[in-house]
A protein has these predicted regions:
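N-terminal targeting or regulatory segments adjacent to alpha/beta-hydrolase or S9 domains
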Residues: 1, 6-79, 83, 128
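Gly/Ser-rich "nucleophile elbow"/oxyanion-hole loop immediately N-terminal to the catalytic nucleophile
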Residues: 151-194
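Short beta-strand/loop motif that positions the catalytic acidic residue
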Residues: 266-267, 272-275, 279
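Conserved alpha/beta-hydrolase "acid-adjacent" motif
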Residues: 280-286
Length: 332
């Protein structure tokens, strides 16, 4: 979850990205309706969305790959912040070209904002026949304002709560956009994320009824404990206590964006967890807390730490693509 969590794959993944250039195809634009389900009143209030129609734009991206194409997609965030560049959600859509309806997955990145790992998984998913919408979280990449130190995960937990709320609402719109694509099976929508992306994904999975499949890698719950105990987040704790904040207040704030808090809403859905037995960033006890709260879904433990889990990258790619590609037993 920490900034240096690049998963050690930047060099490899950049090679996959280097050949990309904007294609000469025509841009696309249109409208999508977000229609709340009948379960919307049961959604926690801070994550609810009203019915709305929103515009989107697509721009084709050239790739040497076969079997899928790639588009840059943008649409307005349902949250308007003080920073205009953060109010547009930027995504990359990896679309399988085979005929028929395809499952589709929202892909979420790590804390450090190194997008290449997410692109690597998105490419693998698309090659496997699974549409992948890689969503860039608030204040990352093109959403980061110049000259202002504002982040989705901040030294001020109140800012972190606001950033995570916006992320979940953006993901909910992303799910609506995916469901509206003619090549997508709207009954088979999922979410996948690594580290911060896994935590955010688990929260979104519990909140958004349209998401029926969830895979969370190097993630966990009890996020206040992760933030408070991590030696690399000393500045966060120091700033909070210097402002007169208590540990109890800190934990109460983080509880509002902890996937464990809402995990009972995800029980009965299809899930897979991929975790590191010796994770020094997301302690195994925090992973187990989320696992228990979700109803003890299938979990794979790698004999690795948060960073050395790179040794299992190909196993992870295979497991993730199979999980989203193959129907559940009761669907086959």
């Amino acid at each position: 979850m920490v900034r240096r969590s690049t998963f050690c794959l930047v060099g490899f993944a950049v090679v996959l990205w280097a050949n990309w250039a904007h294609a000469d195809e025509t841009d696309r634009q249109g409208e999508v309706q977000f229609l709340p389900s009948a379960d919307e009143p049961a959604v926690p209030e801070m994550f609810r969305l009203e019915a709305a129609t929103f515009d989107y734009r697509q721009r084709p991206v050239k790739t040497t790959a076969t079997g899928y194409d790639v588009w840059e997609v943008t649409f307005p965030s349902p949250v308007e912040t003080a920073h205009p560049v953060n109010n547009t959600v930027h995504c990359e859509y990896f679309r399988p070209l085979a005929d028929g309806k395809h499952p589709a997955v929202i892909v979420l990145h790590i804390l450090g904002g190194d997008f290449d790992l997410s692109r690597l998984f998105s490419r693998q998913l698309a090659q496997s026949g699974v549409a992948a919408l890689f969503v860039k979280l608030p204040y990352y990449g093109p959403r980061r304002p110049e000259g202002v130190r504002v982040r989705m995960v901040s030294e001020d937990p109140r800012e972190t709560v606001a950033g995570m709320r916006q992320a979940i609402l953006d993901i909910r719109r992303g799910a609506a956009w995916l469901a509206a694509q003619q090549e997508v099976d709207a009954e088979r929508l999922g979410v996948f994320g690594i580290s911060l992306g896994g935590i955010t994904g688990a929260l979104a999975f519990a909140i958004e009824p349209k998401l029926t499949m969830g895979c969370f890698m190097l993630a966990g719950g009890d996020v206040a404990k992760v933030a408070w105990d991590n030696p690399e987040l000393t500045k966060l704790r120091a700033r909070w206590t210097n402002q007169g904040g208590s540990k109890e207040e800190f934990f109460e704030l983080w509880k509002t964006i902890d996937p464990v808090t809402y995990a009972d809403r995800a029980r009965g859905k299809r899930m897979l967890m991929l975790n590191a037995r010796h994770d020094e960033v997301i302690p195994p006890v925090c992973t187990e807390s989320l696992w228990h709260a979700l109803g003890e879904p299938e979990i794979v433990w790698y004999d690795a730490g948060h960073y050395t889990a790179v040794r299992f990258i190909f196993d992870g790619l295979g497991r993730v693509s199979r999980f989203f590609r193959e129907p559940a037993n009761n669907e086959s």
